[in-house]
Amino acid sequence: MATQTACRVCAGELSLRVVGSNGHAPLAEAFAPSLHETGRHGDLLACVECGTVQQPLLPAGDELHELYRDMRDDAYLGEEAGRRATAAHLLDLIGAQVGGGRLLDVGCGHGLLLDEARSRGYETVGLELSRSAARHARETLGLDVREAPVEDFADDEGFDVVVLADVLEHLDDPVGAVQGCAGLLRPGGVLCVVTPDPSSVIARLAGRRWWGFVPAHACLLPRATLRELLAARGLVISTDVPFVRSFSARRWASGLAERLGPVRAPLEWLAGALPDSASLSLALYDERVIIAHRIDVQHAPQPLLRHRGAAATVALVLPAYNATRTIPDVVAEIPVEAADRALLVDDDSHDDTTSVALAHGLDVIRHPHNRGYGAGQKTGYARALLDGADVIVMVHADGQYAPGLVPEMVAPILEGRADMVIGSRMLRDRAIAGGMPRWKWLGNRMLTAIENRAFGMALSEYHTGYRAFSAQLLRSIPFLRNSDDFVFDQQIFAQVLARGARVVEVPIPTRYFREASSVDLPTSIRYGVQTLGVLGRFVIDRRRGRWPLLRRAAGDLGAQRP
């Protein structure tokens, strides 16, 4: 077994997942993209914190680069038609976000995706270490391909699209690669990542026979961890779908024959009987396409808040959707002496939320697509942390919670008495008098009683959206792995309490009116069921310690220097 080392992604502890059959570093031929023979890899270790599967046997840095430079894949172009169809499908997904401009393909191989992109009007550049593949791209296809690793590549013009397709798993520093590629994006540009998912159902069912376990794969990132790393770079995820590959039907049959022992013989017969022209496009749901946008903050021409010069910086985060009517009143209530910055996250509203917010002094990040209440929090918290906030307060843009209470919300944190503060409508229990429907009041009470038992707490409610966090606490929990839906609120509670954080409640009034509370009964029922699911996972994790949401954060949300 290989000597255990710290995880390359989060520095967590590694444990053996798959025993390898090869105790020696592979030769260059083992790195060919078309080679997917199982059982030729070294020991595969999985991080107990972020779940990344890594192969410590492989060399790193320049030594790894040299192996790729010497690598030849003479079989690659035998499936050129299918590979071009696969590239076309990927470009369809990219084109739905960015329809033109400069495109960089990192690890472009023989240049098939670049050639397809050029035919669609993109201005293309490729990076490829393999001398033979890069030569084919330049001399046969006439493409601009440079033989340089991504960490050494710089371009002052920037790119509208950066593609990392079937590349991230080959790199010994995937975090550095994501950071470098994000830095190459122009404002509004997208990073498209395609990589196998070791946390997928197919990967777990296939076990050691999974196609992702091959000699060339240095780091295999679970879907949730990859999303976390992208969001921690300030990127906004807009697409997360299974990858569709196109190959000849014969190749599909022969590939399955290698992995499905009991039915190998009939599959091999089928592979031999199929005509060469037959092709098939399939998604096995064990490889993802994730597209993330660089969305810059739109700054208000006349900011409502300015840096106060206080020892601690307080940032307000306002998730918003169709909040044109309520923003003016919310802004009017914000005490300007209590915070340094207010950032509204517009979840692709259909009204004038963004323009109204800017006109009233709020900075704005606008999602390219509607993603959900939890997604708005993730975007806002991540941006505030990257900008150096010390305390972050969520203030709803719909006016449901009183912005005038921001000083009371942040005081326990600034005084060192709390890591998280929640504004509770139940401490004085005037919720019904404030307009809360009785069925919501009853559901709140029942769920809170169950949660107190599961969490071992005695809080008056868990279902308030008025919350304040210390930056230190938020950076210590993997909230970027949480749901984009309403259950985000309960997942982050589980994460906070699993850390043993200090939670203080502050009484707040209840405000219910049409714009402030649009959650209907079916949505509330779904939320309740999801909350019970969170509690179940929390209780089980205390015994087994396997829930990724309660593990160490992988994304670095430290303040970025200008």
Protein language model regions, located:
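Hydrophobic helical membrane-anchoring modules
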Residues: 4, 272, 276-287, 296-311, ...
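A conserved acidic beta->alpha catalytic loop
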Residues: 346-354
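Conserved N-terminal segment of class I S-adenosyl-L-methionine
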Residues: 1-165, 175-179, 242-243, 255, ...
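Acceptor/aglycone-binding surface of glycosyltransferases and processive sugar-polymer synthases
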Residues: 365, 369-386, 403-486, 513-532
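N-proximal low-complexity "stem/linker" segments adjacent to membrane-targeting elements
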Residues: 298-333
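Short, acidic, metal-binding catalytic loop of nucleotide-sugar glycosyltransferases
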Residues: 332-340
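S-adenosyl-L-methionine-dependent methyltransferase catalytic module, highlighting the catalytic core
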Residues: 172-183, 190-295
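Short beta-strand-to-loop acidic/aromatic patch adjacent to the donor-nucleotide binding site
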Residues: 389-398
